[in-house]
């Protein structure tokens, strides 16, 4: 599907900021304290969903994010996501699993229930799914704008500095 709009975001509290994707990533919250939400919601058709069924995780992330991150060139976004969602990063699953799936599913109860595994990333937490992308996204935006940003974060011990893979 061809993108024919420039996605902008506004505050949930009503202030009409009209900010782009990269702007809201750096701002975090709207000036009035609200969260950012898209001004319009992209339409995804049944055909789109069918076409996306067999994509890799990185490819599917690209198809969805390109609808919202219209200020990032598509080739750049695609490369970024392919670099983030890689088999060698998401390889902390069960022995014998296909790590290329990034988020494999497994069946229980005779196949009646399927569980999506979101804890195969570097810190073994579901948060890796978003945070790995967010790190790459910040690097891209800050480099493009030739600026720096200091982020102070706090975490609990289960995904923080007690993890061997965490770099401080």
Task: Say what each PLM segment does.
Residues 1-167:
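PLP-dependent amino-acid enzyme catalytic core
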